[in-house]
Curated annotation (Swiss-Prot):
Its cofactor is Ca(2+). Belongs to the glycosyl hydrolase 47 family. Ca(2+) binds at T639. InterPro entries: 6hp_glycosidase-like_sf, Glyco_hydro_47, Glycosyl_Hydrolase_47, Seven-hairpin_glycosidases. It holds the Pfam family Glyco_hydro_47. Involved in the maturation of Asn-linked oligosaccharides. Progressively trim alpha-1,2-linked mannose residues from Man(9)GlcNAc(2) to produce Man(5)GlcNAc(2). The active site is at E528. This is Mannosyl-oligosaccharide 1,2-alpha-mannosidase IA. Its EC number is 3.2.1.113. It is a single-pass type II membrane protein. The gene is MAN1A1. Pathway: Protein modification; protein glycosylation. It catalyses: N(4)-(alpha-D-Man-(1->2)-alpha-D-Man-(1->2)-alpha-D-Man-(1->3)-[alpha-D-Man-(1->2)-alpha-D-Man-(1->3)-[alpha-D-Man-(1->2)-alpha-D-Man-(1->6)]-alpha-D-Man-(1->6)]-beta-D-Man-(1->4)-beta-D-GlcNAc-(1->4)-beta-D-GlcNAc)-L-asparaginyl-[protein] (N-glucan mannose isomer 9A1,2,3B1,2,3) + 4 H2O = N(4)-(alpha-D-Man-(1->3)-[alpha-D-Man-(1->3)-[alpha-D-Man-(1->6)]-alpha-D-Man-(1->6)]-beta-D-Man-(1->4)-beta-D-GlcNAc-(1->4)-beta-D-GlcNAc)-L-asparaginyl-[protein] (N-glucan mannose isomer 5A1,2) + 4 beta-D-mannose; N(4)-(alpha-D-Man-(1->2)-alpha-D-Man-(1->2)-alpha-D-Man-(1->3)-[alpha-D-Man-(1->3)-[alpha-D-Man-(1->2)-alpha-D-Man-(1->6)]-alpha-D-Man-(1->6)]-beta-D-Man-(1->4)-beta-D-GlcNAc-(1->4)-beta-D-GlcNAc)-L-asparaginyl-[protein] (N-glucan mannose isomer 8A1,2,3B1,3) + 3 H2O = N(4)-(alpha-D-Man-(1->3)-[alpha-D-Man-(1->3)-[alpha-D-Man-(1->6)]-alpha-D-Man-(1->6)]-beta-D-Man-(1->4)-beta-D-GlcNAc-(1->4)-beta-D-GlcNAc)-L-asparaginyl-[protein] (N-glucan mannose isomer 5A1,2) + 3 beta-D-mannose.
Length: 659
């Protein structure tokens, strides 16, 4: 979908704060991306760079000639003194009619006073020393530039252009954001379920949320996460020095569960303490889905302006991650210096498909909320790069080099490293009110290839999604992959060639397999990964795959299958998960992950993940709520379960009518 097709949603009133300022400053009258105007009188940066080199060489030649002149003070006086009024003696250094007014005005020191230049010859020598120093520096910079490869010079120019664009955007952050049309909140507040048993179960899940929140507040308030066993704060390196991940991640869950007092104290913390002006290297992916996603969702649900302001502020901070030759963003970014890099373990310095492919929903909303298409252009460029690449067997490898714009190692997974890329293709189509036809095509082409090359059945009929490594299958499925059952079902209604029932059935089969991975453990919660080889089915065989960290993907699929089929087994399976969490993960200080789901003697990992409040408990609560709470036709969940409204094709018409 061309960015131009999105632009009507992102317009803002003329001169309207960030939107108006950025629309002119960065959009370049429609050029976008901070480009200069393309007229005959405008030089490109590359042309300016060449002219600068020529000019530097000319200046070097002129100053170099001075050093070969005879050492005559009179000659040098003639060359320098007459061309430099600052070095000429004053007409009169005594107060009175003969004194120069500009000397008094600009505070210049006079001879005989402290700080005066004194002897003209000494001043001349100082001046020549500065000239030599500047001359040597210019030569050194020119030499370093000429030694660079052409692509390095182009990269420097690109980064400088992007830096200028970001500086312009940052300078406008002090302006008020333009007014936006708030989508009517359909299903943000619900009624109690009519069935008493369902109502009781939902109340229990709300009590679990209170237990998790109250202990976080008691022992780790303002920290990123809670250590529920040792009762202290925990902070992952994913967030750098940014604080409050649990607070931001939990905002919309608190709102949906009508925990009004807790929501207000969370909002107050965001207003007073959430600070992005820190020297912090962060995961662009994690900060986007948790912080930006959480803030945007809280804004749409509550209408509180502070959440929009903070979301756009952080979005601007993440823009330097895109300053690569291909526009594929870095995985890690120092949000103060703007320096990015990739994970050292990633294939050939590559970016990760699931990370750069999971920015789309949030950045489209950032453009809508800021009134500027700059954010949308960044993620649409990612799609352009991907569409220009050959896909092995129609599959998307997990690694893409941001410098070359080419694939790294051919490793394909619908679990870790790849998962949410496919999720966001489908959800981009749905969130656009089904106008983003490019996203729809990419999604169905991708899952067709996945079904052909990755989906298999075990000897006993369990459907699973294997991993593809250079053409060879590894018969392993991760807990993260279990989200795919819900994805297949959610996209089934728009499937081509009468495949709707097929994809609903595929979703049900994946849900069953993931339920089996839970049922075959002692604690009835699933391992991080499970295998289908050597006679083993849906069981973890390696010690480093037996842990459970309060992950949500299985109950996420239960939610979609319940909403789309109303088969009661999904509520039954969800309640089994609730009982297992209460029995094995609940401790006095909150909820903890487990190191081994196959043993009775529990060893806790002592971390209450922020996504437990953002995702796991939210999905469980929604399973036991009526369908009119966050209905799927009006709300799209980002990969951290933050609900974002569908951007209706009629929004622009409504805005225009209200004006």
């Amino acid at each position: 979908m061309p960015v131009g097709g999105l632009l009507p949603l992102f317009s803002s009133p003329a001169g309207g704060g960030l939107g108006g300022g950025l629309g002119g400053g960065l959009g370049g009258g429609g050029g976008g991306g901070g480009r200069k105007g393309s007229g005959p009188s405008a030089f490109r940066l590359t042309e300016k760079f060449v002219l600068l080199l020529v000019f530097s060489a000319f200046i070097t030649l002129c100053f170099g000639a001075i050093f070969f002149l005879p050492d005559s003070s009179k000659l040098l006086s003639g060359v320098l003194f007459h061309s430099s009024p600052a070095l000429q003696p004053a007409a009169d250094h005594k107060p009175g009619p003969g004194a120069r007014a500009e000397d008094a005005a600009d505070g210049r020191a006079r001879p005989g006073e402290e700080g005066a230049p004194g002897d003209p010859a000494a001043a001349l020598e100082d001046n020549l020393a500065r000239i030599r120093e500047n001359h040597e520096r210019a030569l050194m910079e020119a030499k370093e530039t000429l030694q660079k490869l052409p692509e390095e010079i182009q990269r420097d120019i690109l980064m400088e252009k992007e830096k200028v664009a970001q500086d312009q955007m940052s300078n406008r952050m002090g302006f008020r954001l333009p007014p936006v049309y708030l989508v009517p909140l359909i299903g943000a507040i619900d009624r109690e379920p009519a069935d008493a048993a369902v109502r009781e179960k939902r109340a229990k899940i709300k009590e679990m949320m209170k237990h998790a929140w109250n202990n976080y507040k008691l022992y780790a308030w303002g920290k990123n996460e809670l250590k529920p066993v040792s009762k202290g704060g925990h902070s992952s390196s994913l967030f750098g020095n940014i604080k409050g991940a649990t607070i931001v991640d939990a905002l919309d869950t608190l709102f949906i569960m009508k925990m009004k007092n807790e929501f207000e104290e969370a909002k107050a913390w965001v207003e007073e303490h959430l600070n992005f002006n820190v020297n912090a290297e962060v995961s662009v992916f994690e900060v986007n889905i948790r912080f930006i996603g959480g803030l945007i969702s809280a804004y749409y649900l509550s209408g509180e302006e502070i959440f929009r302001k903070k979301a756009v502020e952080l979005g601007v901070k993440l823009l330097p991650a895109f300053y690569t030759p291909s526009g594929i963003p870095w995985a890690l970014l120092n949000i103060k210096s703007g320096i990015g890099r990739n994970w050292p373990w990633a294939s050939g310095g590559s970016s990760i498909l699931a990370e750069f492919g999971t920015l789309h929903l949030e950045f489209i909303h950032l453009s809508y909320l800021s009134g500027n298409p700059f954010f949308a252009e960044k993620v649409m460029n990612i799609r352009k790069v991907l569409n220009n690449l050959e896909k092995p067997q129609g599959l998307y490898p997990n690694y893409l080099n941001p410098n070359s714009g080419q694939w790294g190692q051919y490793h394909v997974s619908v679990g870790g490293l790849g998962d949410s890329f496919y999720e966001y293709l489908l959800k981009a189509w749905l969130m656009s009110d089904k106008t983003d036809l490019e996203a729809k095509k990419m999604y169905f082409d991708a899952i067709k290839a996945i079904e052909t090359h990755l989906i298999r059945k075990s000897r006993n009929g369990l459907t699973y999604i294997a991993e593809w490594k250079g053409g060879l299958l590894e018969h392993k499925m991760g807990h993260l992959t279990c989200f795919a059952g819900g994805m297949f079902a959610l996209g089934a209604d728009d499937a081509p060639d009468g495949l709707t029932q097929h994809y609903l059935q595929l979703g049900a089969e994946i849900a069953r397999t993931c339920h089996e991975s839970y049922s075959r453990t002692f604690v009835k919660l699933g391992p991080e990964a499970f295998r289908f080889d050597g006679g083993v089915e849906a069981i973890a065989t390696r010690q480093n795959e037996k842990y459970y960290i309060l992950r949500p993907e299985v109950v996420e699929t239960y939610l979609y299958m319940w909403r789309l089929t109303h088969d009661p087994k999904y509520r039954k399976w969800a309640w089994e998960a609730v009982e297992a969490l209460e029995k094995h993960c609940r401790v006095n200080g909150g909820y903890s992950g487990l190191r081994d789901v196959y043993v009775s003697a529990q060893t806790y990992d002592d971390v209450q993940q922020s996504f437990f409040l953002a995702e796991t408990l939210k999905y469980l609560y929604l399973i036991f709520s009526d369908d009119d709470l966050l209905p799927l036709e009006h709300w799209i969940f980002n990969t951290e379960a933050h609900p974002l409204p569908v951007l209706s094709r009629n929004i622009k018409k409504v805005e225009d009518n209200e004006k």
